[in-house]
Amino acid sequence: MAIRVYKPTTAGRRNASVSDFSELTRSTPEKSLVRKKSKTGGRNSYGRITSRHRGGGHKRQYRLIDFKRWDKDGVPAKVAEIEYDPNRSARIALLHFADGEKRYIIAPKGIKQGDVIETGAQADIKPGNNLPLKNIPTGTVVHAIELRPLGGAKIARSAGAAVQLVAKDGAYAQLRMPSGEIRNVDARCRATVGEVGNEDHANIQLGKAGRARWIGHRPITRGESMNPVDHPHGGRTRGGKPPVSPWGKGEVRTRRPKKASNKMIVRRRPSGKNRK
């Protein structure tokens, strides 16, 4: 993937950039793997805002992605197409399996049309192949990792994401997350070899507010600039209280200190200026 930078013909085009989409091989999705996706505008079933700053945006269709893959052990698949997915930052790859079935997966870096991908404990260690962590050599970079055996991929699914398998200790594998955290995961959990493609996605500059609206992002207004009736931070009186949401919920360090999964964390992610 490469980034195309616009010439500054207008204020909105100055410094704006876009993907050149050169890796894509098809512009329309596989019809059998597409479902309707309704917009919520950040509202729940009562019509109340539960997720702020969402709404509008271009219409989308949801592409069904195979995050499990374990039911295709031993069945090779050919990469038929590399496609755009409006619902995620990564590209997706359309696989044609030897048994005739078609499925989408997240497209790993370096994968191309015509490549053959395998699933199962005996699969080779090459980008796109999916196998248990216990069968992957230490030091390998992986993505689309399960947190529980057969639970489906949960970790490292966005563009450019990569996790390194740093050690194996009995029934657990130690993973170094993109945040720097080192975490134990059941060695029976599956992962896909390689890193997620479209790694230059983080370098794209929207350039204008309108492009943010196209993807469904609404403006953010600081609570401090509101009136007291609209937000706890509103009004001219400053300081004296910790930052909160418009409904008075704490907005800083909201992770539960006794979370059950804490015992799986070997080393917490670096904080503050030590973060990379």
UniProtKB/Swiss-Prot annotation:
Residue pairs linked by disulfide bridges in the UniProt entry: none
A Gene Ontology cellular-component term: large ribosomal subunit
Polar residues composition bias: residue spans: 16-27
Keyword terms, alphabetized: Ribonucleoprotein, Ribosomal protein, RNA-binding, rRNA-binding
GO BP, sorted A to Z: cytoplasmic translation
Composition bias, Basic residues: 255-276
Region of interest: Disordered: 14-58, 221-276
GO molecular function: rRNA binding; structural constituent of ribosome; transferase activity
Cited function: One of the primary rRNA binding proteins. Required for association of the 30S and 50S subunits to form the 70S ribosome, for tRNA binding and peptide bond formation. It has been suggested to have peptidyltransferase activity; this is somewhat controversial. Makes several contacts with the 16S rRNA in the 70S ribosome.
Family that this chain belongs to: Belongs to the universal ribosomal protein uL2 family.
Quaternary structure and partners: Part of the 50S ribosomal subunit. Forms a bridge to the 30S subunit in the 70S ribosome.
NCBIfam families: rplB_bact
Protein name: Large ribosomal subunit protein uL2
Native species: Bifidobacterium longum subsp. infantis (strain ATCC 15697 / DSM 20088 / JCM 1222 / NCTC 11817 / S12)
